[in-house]
Amino acid sequence: MEEILSVQDLKRVYGRGTAATQALGGVSLSVEQGEFVGIMGPSGSGKTTLLNCIATIDRPTSGSIRVGGQELTGLRGRALTRFRRERLGFIFQDCNLLDTLTAFENIALALAITKAPSGEIESRVREMAQRLGIEDCLDKYPYQMSGGQQQRCAAARAMVTRPDLVLADEPTGALDSRAAGLLLERLERLNQDLGATILMVTHDAFTASCCRRVIFLRDGQIFTQLRRQGDRRDFFRQIMDVVAQLGGEVQNVL
């Protein structure tokens, strides 16, 4: 399989001198095309910092990040903006939908910004909405949708441009268990049916158990990783065992 993401010896230090705090201490990892990978770790482990560096929201102190063979750490200005727009998709805990646009318009905006042919926009929006189970919400504004529908709309917006890599930061964090389950089910299907490559930060073992691989961070470094071999229930138990080693707590259970 083609390597979509390569992170090599990534370090991120905040502050200087005696006030310096190391958030990442030389993290190296890779993600292949079509993988669904989770990142877990206790508070302060560096998982959000890692995702932000890959997302080009934060700039690492040193190290290399390559997405689809493109080195990100040297990108600036228009080149960086274009890369984010065309090669990355983002799903955050806060949906960040535009209140004055319908669901259709929110999703279509991602394509319009990339200057996709106008004839393709409607069909691609409707296809992605159908895959995420929000085809009946396309004419609704965000305030007319449930939290789960809003988050699936945000996921459709992230996926509709067919990015190399989708970055998800606690996408189920603000959802109830039913809405979270629906979102995860749809993300799994997109991963399996379309080969979407997803890197997801989560604190929740149930959410992480939908991934095919989970990387655990502690104190800014990789502690261990697990690959899913059996069913989701078995993988969930394995994740819980590692979380217990890290001294964390698991809120959701199967």
Which ranges hold each PLM region?
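ABC family nucleotide-binding domain
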Residues: E3-R213, L217
